[in-house]
Amino acid sequence: MILARRAVLAATLTLAATLVLGAAVPSRAADDNSVDAIKKRGTIKIGVKYDAPPFGSLNPQTNQVTGFDVDIARAIAKKVLGSPDKVELVQVKSDNRVPLVQNGDIDAFVATATITPARMKTIDFSNVYYRAGQSLLVKKSSSVKSYKDLDGKGVCSVQGSTPEQTIRKLVPKANVVTFETYPECLTALRGGRVDAVTTDNVILGGYEAQDPANLELVGGLFTFEPYGIGIRKGNASLVKAVNDTLADLKKSGEYAKIHERWLKKSVPGDFGQWFNMPAEKAAEQFANQKPG
């Protein structure tokens, strides 16, 4: 009996010590992703998409990821570390980009992410760096011309995206199918499993450009999507560095060059109204819009 009591006491003390040490030493320090920590490390880890042309796509011939978001990521590396080459590009998807930045596995993501009130509860965002709008991609032979034509029809989007949430609200009778990546949605569209793919117009436009004989962008824009760069909650130094990068890109004219390089057109006339808009204001505008 005495030995049993001693064993219980020892186990209790060990557990208590473990809990105290665990509380005192978190698994990953909150400042591991600060600007100072990044400078000491010598590289910045930025998440980008590999399946969202022209914002981020992997070239199978060169095995290099390129795109609008990639150029923004390199500009951030240049601002923070003095060289655009001091960036480690990490593949992210719509459903894992937030957890990756929350856990400190990446320092930030530039990945076609809409600034929303819900997301701002879990991570911080930079100011707005691009504004898109939700649309539809269909086969050219399709009878679908608007989201209003989707009742009883199949529509695909990616998991964890705002377009998925929006289309469910707008067309509750649609058969919404989700995958992790856009290419999976395109396969479903071409194979007849779904009648449309929905996400931001610039992403859909990239896929339309790859197959203009068979695919068509329809429905116009029925939302606006203010894109921000996702950063770990409370990482004020990196938020400032990223916002300073955006301001520099506008002032130098480099942003306009990036826009023309990847989107094949000049910045829009309302560019000054939304570019570098504070994240809080962008989230409020997103929440107050009436899709349709």
Predicted regions and their residues:
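Acidic, polar ligand-binding/catalytic clefts
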Residues: 74, 86-149
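A ligand-binding cleft/hinge motif common to bilobed small-molecule-binding domains
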Residues: 96, 112-121, 166-169, 183, ...
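Extracytoplasmic small-molecule ligand-binding "clamshell" domains
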Residues: 29-108
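Short helix-initiation/N-cap motifs at beta->coil->alpha
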Residues: 31-33, 87-99, 142, 159-162, ...
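Short loop->beta-strand "edge-of-pocket" segments that line small-molecule binding or catalytic clefts
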Residues: 43-48, 66, 148-161
